């Protein structure tokens, strides 16, 4: 890819650590080239304790915006001047828009999830979800699904550090949305079975089953699956986890996190540029072989 950079070229970037593996620079630079937009997207390896300095530098230099990956998603919310409703509830963000020095924090991971589900031909608005996990990806999904109109969400997590934080987020969602959200201890399989039985969608928001530990699965009892259930795994390496493989064998429709990644990027791109990312081109060029 060749790009002619001038004194007018705007800056977009990714902050976090590590970032060298990220497909975001390729996605966003390709999108800008396709649409004739004069931006360049770079990746900067920035540890959490250096985020404040990095943000002030980007603000001062007039960068149009940036994405944030781990470990900076929580601290970035505190560094922003304004936060979106989803970011305020979750306490995390993955996108910053810089409007003349005023920084607004957004989270587009949940937006990417909702679009990926719709892309699979599944409508979960007004229906019930069972969500496994309460970390960053799961929280983004939880918040956006509740804001967008999913009727009921049962969240299952072990009693770790995320559990107490999840209790606070669940309380906010029950207060501010029409969605009924309940947090459960993952240790009770019968409660989980009952939740899945009348859910339209089961989401694995954890890293269980990710490469290289591909034979691990978060659902060990496959009798919990039913043919009306859509099973979504945020993992995209491998494309088909053991969870998805066994769900498919049980007659479930399935989807992975590959297009969630694409569509969260498209949502960030729209916030910065006001333009729709040419997702079909990006999908074909960077995601067809994943």
Listing of model-derived features with the role each one plays in the protein:
Residues 18, 158-162, 237:
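Residues in the short beta-alpha loop(s) of Rossmann-like NAD(P)-binding domains
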Residues 3-120:
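Phosphate/diphosphate ligand-binding glycine-rich loop within oxidoreductases
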Residues 228-230, 234-290:
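Adenosine-phosphate binding glycine-rich loop
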Residues 16, 105-107, 126-147, 157:
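Glycine-rich adenosine-cofactor-binding loop
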Residues 122-128, 225-227:
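Short helix-loop-beta connector
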Residues 148-177:
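NAD(P)-binding Rossmann-fold cofactor-contacting core
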Residues 11, 40, 128, 151-154, ...:
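Residues at the starts of beta-strands that form the adenosine-phosphate
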Residues 179-254:
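Rossmann-like adenosine-cofactor binding region
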């Amino acid at each position: 890819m060749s790009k002619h950079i001038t004194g007018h070229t705007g800056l977009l970037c990714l902050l976090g650590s590590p970032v060298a593996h990220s497909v975001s620079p390729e996605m966003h630079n390709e999108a800008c080239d396709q649409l004739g937009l004069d931006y360049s997207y770079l990746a900067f390896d920035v540890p959490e304790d250096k985020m404040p300095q990095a943000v002030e530098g980007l603000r001062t230099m007039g960068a149009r915006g940036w994405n944030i990956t781990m470990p900076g998603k929580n601290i970035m919310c505190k560094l922003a001047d304004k936060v979106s409703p989803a970011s305020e509830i979750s306490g995390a963000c993955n996108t910053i828009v810089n409007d003349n020095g005023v920084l607004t924090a957004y989270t587009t991971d949940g937006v990417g999830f909702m679009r990926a589900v719709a892309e699979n031909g599944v409508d979960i608005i007004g229906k019930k979800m069972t969500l496994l996990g309460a970390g960053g990806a799961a929280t983004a999904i939880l918040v956006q699904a509740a804001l967008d109109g999913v009727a009921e969400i049962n969240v299952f997590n072990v009693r770790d550090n995320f559990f107490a934080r999840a209790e606070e987020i669940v309380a906010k969602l029950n207060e501010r949305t029409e969605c009924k959200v309940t947090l459960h201890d993952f240790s009770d399989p019968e409660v989980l079975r009952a939740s899945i039985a009348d859910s339209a969608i089961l989401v694995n928001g954890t890293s269980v089953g990710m490469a290289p530990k591909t034979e691990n699965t978060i659902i060990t009892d496959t009798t919990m699956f039913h043919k009306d259930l859509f099973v979504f795994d945020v993992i995209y390496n491998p494309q088909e986890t053991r969870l998805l493989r066994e769900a498919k064998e049980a007659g479930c429709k399935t989807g992975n996190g590959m297009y969630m990644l694409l569509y969260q990027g498209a949502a960030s791109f729209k916030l910065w540029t006001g333009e729709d990312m040419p997702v079909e081109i990006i999908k074909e060029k960077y995601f067809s072989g994943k």
